Amino acid sequence: MMKFIALFALVAVASAGKMTFKDCGHGEVTELDITGCSGDTCVIHRGEKMTLEAKFAANQDTAKVTIKVLAKVAGTTIQVPGLETDGCKFIKCPVKKGEALDFIYSGTIPAITPKVKADVTAELIGDHGVMACGTVHGQVE
């Protein structure tokens, strides 16, 4: 029993500060960091600034990149409105296949955003389909 507790504590410490995410593409996303988030659920606060940083390898040559953010709430998936969709404002375009990219997106969570729990999926879409995709469990407070 003590060995299990020690192993659990070691895993918890090793995971501290790391955001748990699911790569919903083909393994392009190597790292995801959201300001103030760690563990299995990312809690963001209305009216506060947040920064998302994703490191990924481009899986295609593309002249443009489009950002698409989806939220799954109570079994229904909706596209999140009001967010910037031009990915070239956050990474240098054109993009070359195999290029290591660091995507940084900053913004303020609108104060009128309802308190909700959702699975949030962000996709970066190039000329030939999805370039990178990640899903996190999120909660707005």
From Swiss-Prot:
InterPro entries: Ig_E-set, ML_dom, NPC2-like
Residue windows of the Sequence repeats: 64-65, 68-69, 72-73
Outcome of substituting residue 63 to N: In Lep d 2.0201 and Lep d 2.0203
Compartments where located: Secreted
SMART domains xrefs: ML
Positions of disulphide bridges: 24-133, 37-42, 88-93
Assigned keywords, A-Z: Allergen, Disulfide bond, Repeat, Secreted, Signal
Gene Ontology molecular function: sterol binding
Pfam families assigned to the protein according to its UniProt record, in alphabetical order: E1_DerP2_DerF2 (PF02221)
Similarity annotation: Belongs to the NPC2 family.
Subunit structure: Monomer.
The name this protein goes by in its record: Mite group 2 allergen Lep d 2
